[in-house]
Swiss-Prot record:
Pfam families: PD40 (PF07676). Belongs to the TolB family. Its main location: periplasm. It comes from Chlamydia pneumoniae (Chlamydophila pneumoniae). It is found in: Periplasm. InterPro entries: 6-blade_b-propeller_TolB-like, PD40. The lineage of its organism: Bacteria, Pseudomonadati, Chlamydiota, Chlamydiia, Chlamydiales. One of its GO terms (cellular component) is periplasmic space. Keywords: Periplasm, Signal. Disulfide bonds: none annotated. This is Protein TolB homolog. Residues 1-20 form the signal peptide.
Amino acid sequence: MLRQLCFQVFFFCFASLVYAEELEVVVRSEHITLPIEVSCQTDTKDPKIQKYLSSLTEIFCKDIALGDCLQPTAASKESSSPLAISLRLHVPQLSVVLLQSSKTPQTLCSFTISQNLSVDRQKIHHAADTVHYALTGIPGISAGKIVFALSSLGKDQKLKQGELWTTDYDGKNLAPLTTECSLSITPKWVGVGSNFPYLYVSYKYGVPKIFLGSLENTEGKKVLPLKGNQLMPTFSPRKKLLAFVADTYGNPDLFIQPFSLTSGPMGRPRRLLNENFGTQGNPSFNPEGSQLVFISNKDGRPRLYIMSLDPEPQAPRLLTKKYRNSSCPAWSPDGKKIAFCSVIKGVRQICIYDLSSGEDYQLTTSPTNKESPSWAIDSRHLVFSAGNAEESELYLISLVTKKTNKIAIGVGEKRFPSWGAFPQQPIKRTL
């Protein structure tokens, strides 16, 4: 039974290994970062408070460097450099102040610290993202949450179990979401709502069904009365459409369903394609909800297709002929790129398709199979999982530097990451 479940879920991720192509493209680019000095000061002489402020400042520096736009350096005191940030603590109020040559210091944000590092870490992430946007016009990405499936096979378990967890980009603030004692997979942030809702698939009723949970209410609610297996949900906030795959008619087909996050499905689901278009999977909306990218093996090999949905669903078109064994497409938040996986020289790599130019390129090159790329809000960074059938870890990769960093979490298989729950950044750009 476990093999059958795995086949259903991982079809588009693993089937493409059979058709490996001799393709390899390495892209290199130069980028320029903006130097900025970061210092901290406090009016207290308590050494514990001073040490704690230093810890927060260190986190802040890592956060603003994450976006690959700013190059922070720690300074022991406020300097006269052209651009600097000062973290000023008047217990319990911490202010983040912008210092520029010949200009009046500007407080970009301030908040109350609790001296609970887990709580204050999130506040620092939010402050760093505020500064990042103010200085660059590009959203900061340190305050987002990564939701993923963490699974293990215990000695007394016949079937693999997996719960959903969340973590920060650096592996900190790791916390469980579900406690269903079942297999929960493919979580996806919805992208709207102050309680940060997410969709996922759970096997707790025996067959996979789609559920809706949130950071405030982790007890998921089944969202569709549709019969059969339901997989790979994704949501368009703009169009209030839920896309998913179901085998209601025997074949794994692509469906769309008008859906309200508060009241549930509106009307009946619509089957977009039938068995003549092969097995379909991995749907992903563009930001406007007017188009859908997905995978189909109608030509024998899993390939990427795009379907326009406005004003009515139209015939899908093949996205790229270069990569014939593809899976896991993910449309970027800016609508300009699609990340996907493809087998290259026997290894599943992450590739990027540029919609404006029609060009695509290979992003990763390491000899480990990758899957499930998910975009940060800046459309310049991805989280993905990499490993094999028995083990898998989470990684971040920058499209700017092409560098990859492992998220150190601990034991267990980490799969299906989704990067989201980014707080709003209302501040205007300063520079």
